[in-house]
């Protein structure tokens, strides 16, 4: 027999076969126990402080910040099939898994694109580029340019072209440019480097063009600059670029080497950075273009340090970032700047095609300014932008240096980088942030200044183009915003070529500030029609659009001047805003500003910082000034202050003006712009509002547009930068920062109390959200920077700040919408997320999580799965910093829920969240606990509303609170307080409820506690529920059946036996319930029939009569009738029934047998019938009342005495049939059951103690009956039997005429006064003043055994 194979050998073989050499960065699916195969990336264990293990694969999971060391068999490669599989089943796995799938899918697509870009085509290009001759480089450049032009034209003409092909073309072009640069570096060809720069620009713009195709119409002016929509524009653009490149080649600079080296590094980064790099690029590009969806594929901005996400960086757009890099690299000279710019553009590589599902609002305006900057950025702008570029490069470099977190999910990566960026290069961040915020007005002036300065410094070629394009964009945007746009539109449409010509003119008139301004106006006019209409229609809101455009203008102008410096562009927008304000207020102010900005462009960076600081400082004044010009300034203000309010907008304008006034001394570009602007603005500050109201329409409109353009730029990248570096910006800025912060805070306090809380960071976040809300929310890449800002907030646990930010941004959008309703409508239609985005200024992940949480609340049921899922979503929201919002949603849902049971379910969810939070460490655990503690009264009020129908809810909530008390979820004092409140609500009077209080709910000293099984109430009976039975016995006729058989065996029952039998029959029939009560009378057990005579008393009465008949063997009046008749006729009674009947009899016959020897004889004749006595209402009176009846009875008569009428003036009637003779037992029982009237009741009524036997009926009522007292004491008049004939009514003072019932009962009891109807069957031996009733044995007729 072959040896059995070792179990598990197959597994080992599979593992060994699956083992492979994983490389760092490989995308895999890693299986960990308890989790599905999770998307992950192979990582280096050394990076995490672990040693390498060949048996384990170190993976870093997407969607989390966790790593694991998995066996080779648990790791499988991520393929296209796996991707499809994950996409189909990701939704049921939780938000983390969905995010992980999304991230790995994006990374996978990016890697595919990179592979395509680095394929054989790239190798060929590299080989061709590496040819030894430098002279080949220009030709190659020309070829590339031609091919790129063709490609651009083709792409513009065929929008449906495969996106992957476009990506590959762009990537190949970029690689070619890199190779060309490399060759040039080897051959030291300056012209070649210039050509490479142009090629890079072409490649970048071509990819951008594709990205912008969707929004090309919006950016007609920009499309002129960049080949986006029309082949003509593209061709012109390319030709212009070629010309510039040729000029640059002639100017040729030796900086190509450095550029090439950087290009090589960047290219390497592009290939190795992985998803984070691509994401960063995408985010920057998205910021530039406004949305990933529209761009299907994004250009990856591969800066030396910007590979990763451009979070804290001032990368509002890919082109802008590129320029800042280029400037940083080529700031040594104009040629270097151009080359660096080109190189940076070449580093731009399309990474991936974004999912259209990612909803992002595209700010097309942003892209054109960036493109304009890219084209127009000339070497001239290099010097002026160096400072800001350096800071910007540092910002960009920071993410690259921090690439170690590329494996993290977008949100978490953004959080990490935000934290790093927050502490690193705070000055740079602050500058960029401030620039972005205050760059609205400054942007126009900065653009004008930058372009002239670029022209002067760098040369007519690229410098003019850049300045012209920038100015053109600024004017275009301004015109778009203003009504002048209409005028400009026809000219723009008519002269598409004029677009380029204005730039040429601008180049020619490099030194002419007015020429540049005019050029900008011309360009604006030319492009106004397409760009204004499309941009406005596509912008989220008019104000948002204006803001976006203003930042774009800032980017275009400032980027031209600062090129690679997002900070500069941000700062420039501030200056531009100031100049625009001046322009709006004063027409001549624009040219002056342009001149000053052009002259002072070199100081752009520092000026930006100054301007940034100054803007806040000036905000109060400007705010006042701009209140009048809210429509124009509101656009600018929104971008600057980020507050999202018209007041803030005004404040921003004021800030711009003031900042200019404060900053005239600094020589930097901003200060230069501010210099003349300050002079003009200072003058205009007083007249600003007047001029704003009545300033030249075109200029004001242009200013508005410029401001709007600036705002969009801020929304894309500046907003992100602001969010990340809002606080550092103020710190970074000069001493003005403090003033700016203070001013900003003051403005916030005036404008919004919430803004006070958020302060600078809040403002920056608001701006980014306001301008790029849709973009950031919709685009994953852009979302990352936004997430960074948001994450920072969440990391700081400023949930209120986030909410305030969203509120502000919403306000900003609303304010902007108010200023431009039409634009707002278009914006809303464009915004896919719509109301959700307006309500939530958070990342798309946070928004999705909030929506999922709301859905989970709607579908919540009392199951572990649904409550656990909602709890996990709540924990996710706490990670995002919106736990307060989650609790508010939960409380609102709880309050609005109409189903009481679902309210308990929701409160159980609160319990789940609280317990889950208790298990968390750090601040995350205390967030929800503090919220729950604060909202607990509200939650309990909603879960347990007032009313008797919420007892179940109250019990469940008490259980939860006691559990919290036991586990110390919340402070003990608070929990106990709420428990006491709920307990007090539980102690509702019993009268409100139909049921009797449970045994455990009664007081310890309550005698009824011991009688739980007897079904009696505080008054000795349970007749409360069957009160009608006394008056209408037929109702219980059927129920009484079976009780008549109680007359069978009359076996005397001891208290122990009786109680035991009663316990065995806890639920006797209704009649029995009413007929027996146990009362405690002086420690003795006494039976008393308290039930209505006709319903419950029928059976008991039969037994009683039988017993009485036994006792009354010597019945004088009715000798013929004996208990034997009854006994024989009636079936034997069950022991329990007998016991109960005996009890009732003992109660009814509660006479002091000690005084009645005959009764004693009866008692001894049979076993004593005793039950555990039970107080009937007030026990003493009831017992005394019973005993009182016997006071007038002769003792010596024994049973005969019992049957004798009670001594009274009216002796009982002689006829035995009427008096004491029993009817035939059947008849007797039947008559009693049927409640037949007894004609001779009156006979007994007179002799019996005539305390209304209705009182005994009354005893059945809930309130304590004092009729028992009447039983003891004879009332002066008799009102008839206590239990009257059912047919005759409850109160009959006539004779007790039920000879059936009465005869049997009165044979034993012989009362002249009719006893209680049901008591008649029991022999009542009353003594006048017996001290208490005594149990009576009714088995032995005629004898009482006295104790």
From Swiss-Prot:
Disruption phenotype: No visible phenotype under normal growth conditions, but the triple mutant plants hulk1, hulk2 and hulk3 show delayed flowering. The lineage of its organism: Eukaryota, Viridiplantae, Streptophyta, Embryophyta, Tracheophyta. Residues 1038-1049 have a biased composition (Acidic residues). GO terms for biological process: flower development; mRNA processing. Keywords: Developmental protein, Flowering, mRNA processing, Nucleus, Transcription, Transcription regulation. It is found in: Nucleus. Residues 845-986 form the CID domain. Residues 110-137, 251-320, 383-402, 1037-1069, 1121-1140, 1147-1223, 1259-1347 are annotated as: Disordered. It comes from Arabidopsis thaliana. Probable transcription factor that acts with partial redundancy with HULK1 and HULK2. Plays diverse and essential roles in the control of plant development, physiology and flowering time. Residues 24-81 form the PWWP domain. Expressed throughout young primordia, and vegetative and reproductive apices. SMART domains: PWWP, RPR. InterPro entries: CID_dom (IPR006569), ENTH_VHS (IPR008942), PWWP_dom (IPR000313). PROSITE patterns: CID, PWWP. This is Protein HUA2-LIKE 3. Residues 127-137, 1181-1191 have a biased composition (Polar residues). Residues 390-402, 1054-1069, 1259-1272 have a biased composition (Basic and acidic residues). It comes from the Eukaryota.
């Amino acid at each position: 027999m072959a040896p059995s194979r070792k179990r598990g050998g197959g597994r080992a073989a599979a593992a060994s076969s699956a083992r492979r050499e994983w490389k760092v960065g490989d995308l895999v699916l890693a299986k960990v126990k308890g989790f599905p195969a999770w998307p992950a990336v192979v990582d280096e264990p050394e990076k995490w402080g672990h040693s390498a293990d060949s048996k384990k694969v170190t993976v870093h999971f997407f969607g989390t910040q966790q790593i694991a060391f998995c066996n080779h068999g648990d790791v499988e490669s991520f393929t296209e099939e796996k991707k499809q599989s994950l996409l189909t089943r990701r939704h049921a796995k939780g938000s983390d898994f969905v995010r992980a799938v999304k991230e790995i899918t994006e990374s996978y697509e990016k890697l595919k694109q990179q592979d395509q870009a680095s394929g054989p085509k790239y190798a060929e290009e590299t080989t061709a580029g590496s040819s030894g001759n430098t002279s080949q480089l220009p030709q190659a450049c020309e070829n590339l340019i031609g091919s790129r032009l063709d490609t651009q034209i083709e792409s513009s003409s065929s929008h449906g072209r495969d996106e992957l092909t476009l990506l590959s073309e762009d990537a190949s072009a970029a690689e070619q440019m890199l190779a060309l640069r490399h060759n040039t570096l080897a051959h030291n060809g300056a012209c070649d480097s210039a050509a490479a720069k142009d090629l890079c620009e072409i490649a970048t713009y071509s990819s951008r063009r594709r990205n912008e195709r969707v929004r090309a119409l919006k950016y007609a002016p920009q499309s002129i600059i960049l080949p986006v929509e029309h082949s003509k524009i593209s061709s012109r653009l390319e030709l212009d670029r070629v010309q510039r490149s040729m000029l640059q080649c002639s100017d040729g600079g030796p900086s190509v080497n450095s550029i090439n080296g950087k290009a090589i590094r960047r290219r390497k980064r592009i290939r190795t950075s992985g998803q984070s790099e691509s994401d960063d690029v995408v985010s920057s590009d998205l910021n530039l273009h406004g949305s990933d969806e529209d761009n299907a594929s994004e250009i990856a901005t591969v800066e030396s340090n910007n590979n990763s996400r451009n979070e804290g960086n001032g990368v509002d757009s890919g082109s802008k970032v590129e320029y800042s890099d280029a400037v940083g690299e080529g700031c040594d000279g104009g040629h270097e700047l151009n080359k660096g710019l080109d190189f940076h553009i070449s580093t731009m590589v399309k990474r991936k095609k974004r999912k259209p599902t990612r909803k992002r609002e595209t700010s097309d305006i942003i892209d054109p300014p960036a493109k304009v900057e890219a084209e127009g950025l000339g070497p001239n702008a290099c010097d002026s932008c160096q400072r800001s570029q350096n800071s910007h490069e540092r910002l960009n470099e920071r993410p690259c240096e921090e690439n170690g977190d590329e494996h993290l999910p977008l949100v978490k990566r953004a959080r990490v980088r935000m934290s790093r960026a927050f502490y690193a290069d705070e000055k740079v961040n602050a500058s960029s942030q401030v620039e972005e915020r205050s760059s609205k007005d400054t942007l126009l002036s900065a653009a004008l200044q930058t372009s002239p300065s670029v022209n002067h410094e760098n040369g007519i070629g690229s410098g003019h183009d850049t300045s012209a394009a920038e100015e053109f964009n600024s004017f275009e945007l301004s015109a778009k915003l203003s009504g002048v746009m209409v005028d400009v539109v026809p000219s723009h449409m008519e002269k598409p070529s004029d677009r380029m010509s204005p730039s040429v003119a601008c180049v020619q008139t490099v030194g002419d500030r007015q020429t540049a301004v005019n050029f900008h106006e011309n360009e604006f006019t030319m492009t106004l029609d397409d760009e204004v209409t499309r941009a406005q229609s596509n912008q989220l809101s008019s104000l948002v659009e204006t803001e976006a455009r203003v930042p774009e203008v800032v980017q275009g102008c400032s980027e031209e001047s600062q090129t690679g410096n997002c900070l500069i562009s941000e700062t420039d927008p501030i200056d531009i805003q100031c100049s625009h304000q001046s322009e709006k207020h004063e027409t001549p102010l624009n040219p002056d500003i342009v001149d000053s900005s052009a002259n002072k462009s070199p100081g752009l960076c520092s000026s930006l910082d100054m301007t940034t600081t100054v803007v806040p400082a000036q905000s109060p004044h400007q705010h006042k000034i701009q209140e009048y010009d809210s429509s124009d300034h509101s656009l600018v203000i929104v971008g600057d202050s980020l507050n999202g309010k018209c007041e803030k907008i005004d404040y921003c304008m004021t800030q711009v003006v003031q900042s200019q006034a404060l900053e005239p001394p600094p020589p930097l570009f901003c200060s230069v712009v501010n210099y003349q602007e300050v002079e003009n603005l200072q003058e205009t500050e007083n007249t600003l509002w007047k001029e704003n109201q009545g300033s030249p329409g075109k200029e004001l409109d242009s200013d508005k547009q410029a401001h709007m353009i600036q705002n969009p730029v801020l929304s894309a990248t500046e907003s992100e930068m602001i969010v990340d570096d809002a606080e550092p910006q103020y710190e970074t800025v000069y001493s003005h920062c403090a003033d700016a912060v203070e001013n900003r805070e003051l403005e916030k306090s005036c404008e919004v109390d919430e803004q006070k809380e958020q302060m600078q960071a809040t403002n920056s976040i608001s701006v980014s959200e306001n301008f790029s809300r849709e973009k950031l929310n919709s685009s994953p890449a852009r979302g990352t920077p936004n997430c960074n800002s948001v994450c920072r907030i969440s990391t700081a646990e400023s949930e209120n700040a986030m909410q305030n930010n969203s509120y502000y941004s919403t306000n900003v959008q609303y304010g902007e919408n108010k200023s431009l309703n039409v634009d707002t409508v278009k914006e809303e239609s464009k915004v896919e997320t719509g109301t959700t985005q307006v309500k939530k200024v958070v990342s798309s992940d946070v928004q999705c999580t909030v929506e999922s949480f709301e859905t989970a609340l709607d579908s919540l049921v009392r199951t572990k799965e649904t409550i656990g899922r909602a709890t996990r979503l709540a924990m996710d929201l706490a990670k995002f910093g919106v736990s307060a919002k989650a609790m508010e949603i939960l409380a609102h849902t709880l309050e609005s829920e109409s189903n009481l049971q679902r309210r308990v379910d929701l409160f159980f969810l609160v319990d789940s969240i609280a317990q889950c939070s208790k298990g968390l460490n750090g601040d995350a655990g205390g967030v929800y606990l503090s919220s729950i503690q604060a909202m607990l009264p509200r939650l309990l009020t909603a879960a347990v509303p007032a009313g008797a129908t919420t007892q179940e809810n109250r019990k469940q909530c008490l259980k939860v609170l006691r559990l919290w008390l036991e586990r110390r979820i919340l402070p003990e004092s608070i929990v106990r307080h709420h428990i006491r409140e709920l307990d007090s609500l539980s102690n509702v009077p019993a009268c409100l409820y139909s049921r009797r209080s449970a045994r455990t709910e009664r007081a310890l000293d309550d005698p009824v506690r011991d009688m739980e099984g007897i079904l009696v109430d505080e008054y000795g009976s349970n007749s409360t529920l069957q009160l009608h039975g006394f008056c209408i016995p037929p109702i219980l006729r059927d129920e009484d059946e079976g009780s008549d058989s109680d007359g069978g065996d009359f076996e005397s029952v001891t208290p122990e036996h009786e109680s035991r039998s009663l316990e065995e029959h806890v639920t006797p029939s209704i009649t029995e319930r009413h007929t027996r009560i146990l009362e405690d009378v002086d420690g003795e057990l006494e039976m008393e029939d308290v039930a209505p005579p006709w319903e419950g008393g029928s059976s008991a009465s039969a037994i009683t009569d039988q017993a009485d008949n036994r006792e009354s063997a010597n019945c004088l009046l009715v000798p013929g009738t004996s208990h034997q008749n009854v006994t024989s006729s009636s079936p034997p009674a069950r022991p329990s029934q007998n016991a109960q009947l005996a009890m009732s009899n003992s109660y009814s016959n509660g006479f002091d047998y000690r005084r009645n020897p005959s009764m004693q004889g009866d008692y001894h004749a049979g076993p004593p019938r005793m039950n555990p006595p039970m107080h009937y209402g007030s026990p003493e009176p009831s017992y005394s009342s019973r005993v009182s009846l016997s006071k007038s009875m002769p003792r010596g008569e024994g049973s005969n005495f019992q049957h004798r009428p009670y001594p009274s003036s009216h002796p009982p009637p002689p006829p035995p049939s009427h008096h004491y003779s029993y009817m035939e037992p059947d008849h007797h029982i039947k008559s009693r059951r049927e409640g037949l009237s007894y004609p001779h009741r009156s006979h007994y009524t007179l002799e019996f103690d005539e305390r209304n036997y209705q009182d005994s009926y009354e005893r059945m009522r809930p309130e304590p009956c004092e009729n028992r007292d009447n039983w003891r004491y004879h009332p002066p008049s008799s009102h008839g039997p206590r239990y009257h004939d059912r047919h005759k009514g409850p109160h009959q003072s006539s004779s007790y005429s039920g000879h059936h019932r009465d005869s049997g009962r009165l044979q034993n009891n012989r009362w002249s006064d009719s006893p209680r109807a049901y008591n008649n069957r029991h022999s009542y031996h009353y003594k006048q003043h017996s001290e208490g009733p005594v149990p009576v044995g009714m088995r032995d007729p005629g004898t009482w055994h006295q104790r």
